[in-house]
From Swiss-Prot:
Entry protein name: UTP--glucose-1-phosphate uridylyltransferase
The species this protein was found in: Pseudomonas aeruginosa (strain ATCC 15692 / DSM 22644 / CIP 104116 / JCM 14847 / LMG 12228 / 1C / PRS 101 / PAO1)
Domain of life: Bacteria
Gene: galU
Keywords recorded for this protein, A-Z: Nucleotidyltransferase, Transferase
GO biological process, one term: UDP-alpha-D-glucose metabolic process
EC category: transferase
Length: 279
C-alpha cells in the first residue's frame, strides 16, 4: 500500500523571473490556490497522506503554507472569509509534512534521491507541482496510477502524446502496448531531438516508484550539466521489465511555461472557481 508522496520543489523557477526571485514557483497561484496545494490535494485524494517535500534555499513559504496561521485565523474567525481556509486546513489536519533540503540542483534524479530519508524502503509517488493535472470527470491522475500500481506492483510513469517537434522538452518512452492506455517500457530517452525520438509519448510529472529506484539513482552517472536524470535509473528498471507507462485520463497543464500557466488559470477559473469548487 502506497502512503507517501514526494514533491521535488528545490528548483529556481527561472522561467518565471522576476516573480520567482523571492517566491518558490510552487507557490505561484492558479486563481486562489498555489500550485503545490493542488498537488497535495491530488495526493490526498489518492490516499497518500504522508507528504515529503524536497526544498531549497528561499523556500520557507512552502512550509509556512502547510502550517496553521493563528493570527490570520483569529482575524477572520466568525466571518464569511473562514470558508477560504477550509481546503488548506483539511490538508494540515489529514496529512503529515516532512521536509529536507537539496543543497545542489543536480537534476530530478538527485532531488528524488535527496528525499530518500523521508521515504524509507517502500513504494512512493513523485509529483512535480508545476505539472497541474486535473480530471473533473473521475479519479485524479495520481489515484488512477495508484490503482494501477495495486494491480501490477511496479514503477509507473504518466505519459501523454505531444507534438513530435516538442519531444526535446521531455523524457520520451517506447514500448509494448499491454492495453490501449498502458505500455511496458523498453526504451526511455531524456529530451531527444525530434528526429531521434522513439515515439511522441512524453513523460509528465507523475510517477509511482518502487524503493529500489534509490540504489539505481546512486549508480547513475551524471549527464549533461552534471545532472542525474530519473529516466536513466528508470531505464535500468525497464531492462528488467518492471516499468509501465500510463496514458492518464484528464488534463495536464505545463505551469512551468507562461502559456500553460495562463491556460491553467483560465481553466480553473471557469471550471472550479466560478462553480464554487476551488476552496
Amino acid at each position: 500500500m502506497i502512503k507517501k508522496c514526494l514533491f521535488p520543489a528545490a528548483g529556481y523557477g527561472t522561467r518565471f523571473l522576476p516573480a520567482t526571485k523571492a517566491m518558490p514557483k510552487e507557490m505561484l497561484p492558479v486563481v486562489n490556490k498555489p500550485l503545490i496545494q493542488y498537488a497535495v490535494e491530488e495526493a490526498l485524494e489518492a490516499g497518500l497522506s504522508e507528504i515529503g517535500i524536497v526544498t531549497g534555499r528561499g523556500k520557507r513559504s512552502l512550509e509556512d503554507h502547510f502550517d496553521i496561521s493563528y493570527e490570520l485565523e483569529h482575524q477572520i474567525r466568525n466571518t464569511d472569509k473562514e470558508k477560504y481556509l477550509v481546503g488548506i486546513r483539511r490538508l494540515i489536519d489529514e496529512c503529515t509534512f516532512a521536509y529536507t533540503r537539496q543543497v545542489e540542483m543536480k537534476g530530478l534524479g538527485h532531488a528524488i534521491l535527496t528525499g530518500r530519508p523521508l521515504i524509507g524502503d517502500e513504494p512512493f509517488a513523485v509529483v512535480l507541482a508545476d505539472d497541474l493535472c486535473l480530471n473533473l470527470e473521475g479519479d485524479s491522475v495520481l489515484k488512477q496510477m495508484v490503482k494501477l500500481y495495486n494491480q501490477f506492483r511496479c514503477s509507473i510513469v504518466a505519459i501523454q502524446e505531444v507534438p513530435p517537434e516538442e519531444t526535446n522538452k521531455y523524457g520520451v518512452i517506447a514500448g509494448e502496448m499491454i492495453r490501449d492506455d498502458i505500455f511496458r517500457v523498453n526504451t526511455m530517452v531524456e529530451k531527444p531531438k525530434p528526429e531521434e525520438a522513439p515515439s511522441n509519448l512524453a513523460i509528465i510529472g507523475r510517477y509511482i516508484l518502487t524503493p529500489d529506484i534509490f540504489d539505481l539513482i546512486e549508480q547513475t552517472e551524471p549527464g549533461k550539466g552534471g545532472e542525474i536524470q530519473i529516466t536513466d535509473a528508470l531505464m535500468k528498471q525497464a531492462q528488467d521489465g518492471c516499468v509501465l507507462a500510463y496514458k492518464f485520463k484528464g488534463k495536464r497543464f505545463d505551469c512551468g511555461s507562461a502559456e500553460g500557466y495562463i491556460e491553467a488559470t483560465n481553466f480553473c477559473y471557469e471550471n472550479l472557481y466560478k462553480t464554487g469548487k476551488a476552496h
